Structures are given as structure tokens and as C-alpha cells.
Amino acid sequence: MAFPGSGRSIPGQLCAGVFSGLIQPPLGQKFYCPNGGGAVPSPLPQALSAPQCNGEGRDPEPDRPIGYGAFGVVWSVTDPRDGKRVALKKMPNVFQNLVSCKRVFRELKMLCFFKHDNVLSALDILQPPQIDCFEEIYVITELMQTDLHKVIVSPQPLSSDHIKVFLYQILRGLKYLHSAGILHRDIKPGNLLVNSNCVLKICDFGLARVEELDESQHMTQEVVTQYYRAPEILMGSRHYRSAIDIWSVGCIFAELLGRRILFQAQSPIQQLDLITDLLGTPPLTAMRSACEGARAHILRGPHKPPSLSVLYMLSGEATHEAVHLLCRMLLFDPLKRISAKDALAHPYLEEGRLRYHTCMCHCCYSVSSGRVYTADFEPTATNRFDDSYEKSLTSVWQVKELVHRFITDQHQGKRPPLCINPHSAAFKTFIRSTAWHSSKVSKKEER
């Protein structure tokens, strides 16, 4: 079952980079030409209409910038090899220090590792220049029309069918990531891309990393946008597991039901207070990994009983099955929180699974006698993502050489490589849009 849209594109929030210079393509190679550059259109809530099967939908609008973020701009561009429109993401200034080098290399390898319909992956990487001039990376991904944040804040009605099929796809993609040993660590509506047929893909792996199995190894707490941050991170836990992503999905589930952020606080402490207002004062066993200050903050306050019944007031779509699944996701104790695999087996998502695999997915297909379904509706990764190479990375130049070789190797035996074409008529518009945004980002970061 597809969810058709108007066929027009909606700007989506994607992470990319601010262009700091031009890359001259090597002689004899094809140009990758951003062509377009019109103003970004306003969000079109009609992109989600009443659920029905209608095939693939219309093509996007002409090429243009489709998203701005703290790291720059993403453009819709045309691949000259086949005429298809795709998204072009830039990772700028990636070799400034060893930490950023490792992060970008990890994200790049992940984008090339992913093979799942609900996880954004790299379709191609633009050919890099000679290593001495190599400072930025351009990644081509599938073009998506909007993100879940824009869907939620739009006036477009969201039916129970929409909510179920969105949640099903989020958990389907998350099950795949977790099976590969990957924690996303920034699941939020803006990082869930949606096309005009309501197909959803998890994106933005800048904070993603392999799950650390050794509990003695500390992990950063500077992860996850605050509204979607799990209580164990808010309470200073130095080690966490995939349950942090499930908490984020629970917050998004509630947001889909109520069309507003579930825990919207001004500070991490207030965020924790809002969580305990809903879930009640947690037992000591649920705070086993909390820092002393956070534990003391909870214990010196008045005892709070749970008030989970208010979840039924989110909307008319908050049925008993919906609230039951939501409560399994929003458990204070991460060890008791439901997994993506078990959540997918919940009765609430049965209809979402059926609708998705009826005519939205690529793993099932129709024949004259009916629908042929895949043997595995929610596949896992064939192997864990290997990050063991990171231990041997000791210098910026070493990483730069490895990244350059990695990108070059991606093109071996494949289609002709592409490069940025600075002579394109639209390139000046591209540069102006990124230069303007660069100044805005700089001012924002100073505040």
C-alpha cells in the first residue's frame, strides 16, 4: 500500500557541507553538474494524502537546493549518466583534525556498507582530486522529498495507517542497524527522510558508532538531540546500548500521535523532570549507571507516581495497542526497554507491515496471480560493521590517504566516475547559496 503525494518535492533537512572552493574535474571524466538553483519551495502538506496504491509517484521538481543544516547545503542534482535526480551531500573540511577525520571516514564507510530499504546509503562518491588538493567529500544518495519533522508540523492529517507504516519502517531500519552493531545516537524526526509515497529512510550517521560491548569503556554523552535523549544519557551514564535509539523512537511515536514534542524542556535537568512526571520516580535499579548528582536530584525530590494514562489523550489514534507499545519503548530502565526486533512483533504494527509489503517495498513483487512476498520481512545485516581499523589511525595524513584510496577503490569496475563541474551555469548559484548559508551558520554557532 502506497501513500501517494502531489508529486512535487518538499525541502528536506539533510546534513552536508558548506562549499569552500571548486574542484576541477580531471581531463576526460564526466562532469557532475548541479543544474537548477531556484528558490526552495514551501513545504507542501499535500505530499501525504489518503492511503492508496498508486505505483511510484511523479518525478521531483527541477533541480535546486533541498536542505540546509549546520554543516551546509544539500542539492538535488541530475546524474548525467542516466538522467536520474539524486541528492548531493558535501562533507567539507574533513581533514582538520584526527577526531573529525575518523568520524567522517566512519560515516563514509557506513554509507557504503548499508544495504537496506529504510536506511539511506551512498549511491556513489564523487571522484576526489589529487590527494594534495583533497579537502572535501561529495556523496550521492537517493533523493527524498521531505523529512518526518516537516510532516508532523504540517496541517496534513495523519491517519492511523500513516502512523503505523512510518513506525514500522523506522523500527525495520533500526533493527538492521542494531544487527550490524551500530548505534545511530541521533534518531529524531529530522533524520527520518520521507518521499512522496511515504517510504522512509533513516539518515545522518555523523554521530553513529559501533556498540561498545566492554562496559568499562566510556562513551560520549554528547549524543542525541535533547528532546529525544534517553534518561540514562541524561543521568550521565558512561556506557549505553541500543536501547537509547528505542527511547528516541518512542518519543517520535508519541509525536506522531499527538503532533507535538512529548518531552520539550529547556535544559537536560528539566528534560529528566518531564520524564519522571510521566513515568514516575524510577526505582534504584533503573538508575544503576547514573552519576551521583543525577541520582541525588531524583531522590531528593518528591516521590512521583506514574501518569501513563495521559498517553491516551495524545489523540484519537492512541489506542490501547498503541499505548501499550509506546510504554514498552519509554521504560526508564534500558535493560527492560523493548528491542527493535520485539517491537516489530507487536500486534500494533501488523497492519503497518501488511501495508508496507503490499506495494511500498522493493523486497516483494506482484505477478499476474497475485503478490509474491519475501521470506524475511525485516532482514538483518549479513555481518557486523567492522570498525577495528580505527585503532590504527594515528595521523590526519594517514586517514586522508586511506579515505582517498577508499573512494577511488569504490569506482573500480563500476560506472564512469563523476566530478563537480565548476563551469556549470548553475554553479555560481550553488556557490552563492552555500556562501550565504556559511555566514549564517557562523553567527549561529557563536551564540
UniProtKB/Swiss-Prot annotation:
<feature type="binding site">
    <location>
        <begin position="66"/>
        <end position="74"/>
    </location>
    <ligand>
        <name>ATP</name>
    </ligand>
</feature>
<dbReference type="GO" id="GO:0007179">
    <property type="term" value="P:transforming growth factor beta receptor signaling pathway"/>
</dbReference>
<dbReference type="InterPro" id="IPR017441">
    <property type="entry name" value="Protein_kinase_ATP_BS"/>
</dbReference>
<protein>
    <recommendedName>
        <fullName>Serine/threonine-protein kinase NLK2</fullName>
        <ecNumber>2.7.11.24</ecNumber>
    </recommendedName>
</protein>
<dbReference type="GO" id="GO:0001707">
    <property type="term" value="P:mesoderm formation"/>
</dbReference>
<keyword id="KW-0833">Ubl conjugation pathway</keyword>
<keyword id="KW-0963">Cytoplasm</keyword>
<keyword id="KW-0217">Developmental protein</keyword>
<keyword id="KW-0597">Phosphoprotein</keyword>
<dbReference type="GO" id="GO:0004674">
    <property type="term" value="F:protein serine/threonine kinase activity"/>
</dbReference>
<dbReference type="GO" id="GO:0007399">
    <property type="term" value="P:nervous system development"/>
</dbReference>
<feature type="binding site">
    <location>
        <position position="89"/>
    </location>
    <ligand>
        <name>ATP</name>
    </ligand>
</feature>
<dbReference type="GO" id="GO:0004707">
    <property type="term" value="F:MAP kinase activity"/>
</dbReference>
<keyword id="KW-0479">Metal-binding</keyword>
<dbReference type="GO" id="GO:0035556">
    <property type="term" value="P:intracellular signal transduction"/>
</dbReference>
<dbReference type="InterPro" id="IPR003527">
    <property type="entry name" value="MAP_kinase_CS"/>
</dbReference>
<keyword id="KW-0539">Nucleus</keyword>
<keyword id="KW-0808">Transferase</keyword>
<feature type="active site" description="Proton acceptor">
    <location>
        <position position="186"/>
    </location>
</feature>
<dbReference type="GO" id="GO:0106310">
    <property type="term" value="F:protein serine kinase activity"/>
</dbReference>
<dbReference type="GO" id="GO:0018105">
    <property type="term" value="P:peptidyl-serine phosphorylation"/>
</dbReference>
<dbReference type="GO" id="GO:0005737">
    <property type="term" value="C:cytoplasm"/>
</dbReference>
<dbReference type="GO" id="GO:0016055">
    <property type="term" value="P:Wnt signaling pathway"/>
</dbReference>
<comment type="similarity">
    <text>Belongs to the protein kinase superfamily. CMGC Ser/Thr protein kinase family. MAP kinase subfamily.</text>
</comment>
<dbReference type="InterPro" id="IPR050117">
    <property type="entry name" value="MAP_kinase"/>
</dbReference>
<feature type="domain" description="Protein kinase">
    <location>
        <begin position="60"/>
        <end position="349"/>
    </location>
</feature>
<keyword id="KW-0547">Nucleotide-binding</keyword>
<dbReference type="GO" id="GO:0005634">
    <property type="term" value="C:nucleus"/>
</dbReference>
<dbReference type="InterPro" id="IPR011009">
    <property type="entry name" value="Kinase-like_dom_sf"/>
</dbReference>
<keyword id="KW-0460">Magnesium</keyword>
<keyword id="KW-0804">Transcription</keyword>
<keyword id="KW-0067">ATP-binding</keyword>
<dbReference type="GO" id="GO:0018107">
    <property type="term" value="P:peptidyl-threonine phosphorylation"/>
</dbReference>
<comment type="function">
    <text>Negatively regulates Wnt/beta-catenin-signaling during development. Plays a role together with sox11 in neural induction during early embryogenesis. Involved in TGFbeta-mediated mesoderm induction in early embryos, acting downstream of map3k7/tak1 to phosphorylate stat3.1. Augments the rnf138/narf-directed ubiquitination and degradation of tcf/lef by enhancing the association of rnf138/narf and tcf/lef. Phosphorylates mef2a to play a role in anterior neural development, including eye formation.</text>
</comment>
<dbReference type="GO" id="GO:0000287">
    <property type="term" value="F:magnesium ion binding"/>
</dbReference>
<keyword id="KW-0879">Wnt signaling pathway</keyword>
<dbReference type="Pfam" id="PF00069">
    <property type="entry name" value="Pkinase"/>
</dbReference>
<dbReference type="GO" id="GO:0140297">
    <property type="term" value="F:DNA-binding transcription factor binding"/>
</dbReference>
<dbReference type="InterPro" id="IPR008271">
    <property type="entry name" value="Ser/Thr_kinase_AS"/>
</dbReference>
<dbReference type="GO" id="GO:0031398">
    <property type="term" value="P:positive regulation of protein ubiquitination"/>
</dbReference>
<keyword id="KW-0418">Kinase</keyword>
<dbReference type="GO" id="GO:0009952">
    <property type="term" value="P:anterior/posterior pattern specification"/>
</dbReference>
